[in-house]
């Protein structure tokens, strides 16, 4: 049995996900994150699991195997990083129409929003002490 595989990196906030995507001829969808099943790693959180699986659901792909290695950030950022990496890796295997679907739905775009740094003289990034005119 020959496996087609590809290795891709996805980033979100301070999370970095490196995935290896296998597309075997048969077999169900299996996602392992840092050696654990995705449902267990994401602490039984259905929202984050749905985020990770959304590229496969959009393209109606049932035969896949994903090995993801993530570090940094929280569960939500890690899930988004995995989603981006999966989408990028799928874009290599699929036709142009399906790639366009991914692009239109924002799956191939990196969300560059990250935490703003704290400035000196302020309490937080933008929270200033109360201003008194007199």
From Swiss-Prot:
Keyword Chloroplast: yes
One of the GO BP terms on file: translation
UniProt xrefs under Gene3D superfamilies: 3.30.230.10
HAMAP family in the record: Ribosomal_uS9_B
Keyword annotations of the record: Chloroplast, Plastid, Ribonucleoprotein, Ribosomal protein
GO molecular function terms noted in the UniProt entry: RNA binding; structural constituent of ribosome
Main location (coarse class): plastid
GO CC list: chloroplast; small ribosomal subunit
Name the record gives this protein: Small ribosomal subunit protein uS9c
Places the protein is found: Plastid, Chloroplast
Provenance organism: Euglena gracilis
PROSITE patterns: RIBOSOMAL_S9 (PS00360)
Family: Belongs to the universal ribosomal protein uS9 family.
């Amino acid at each position: 049995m020959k496996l087609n595989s590809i290795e891709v990196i996805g980033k979100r906030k301070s999370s970095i996900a490196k995935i290896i995507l296998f597309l075997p001829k048969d077999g169900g969808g299996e996602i392992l994150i840092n050696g654990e099943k995705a449902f267990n790693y994401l602490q039984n959180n259905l929202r984050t699991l749905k985020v990770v699986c959304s590229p496969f659901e959009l393209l109606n792909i049932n035969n896949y195997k994903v090995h993801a290695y993530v570090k940094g950030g929280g569960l939500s950022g890690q899930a988004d990083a995995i989603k981006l990496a999966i989408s990028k890796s799928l874009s290599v295997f699929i036709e142009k129409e399906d790639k366009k679907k991914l692009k239109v739905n924002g799956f191939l775009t990196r969300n560059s929003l990250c935490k703003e740094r704290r400035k000196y003289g302020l309490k937080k990034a933008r929270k200033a002490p109360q201003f008194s005119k007199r």
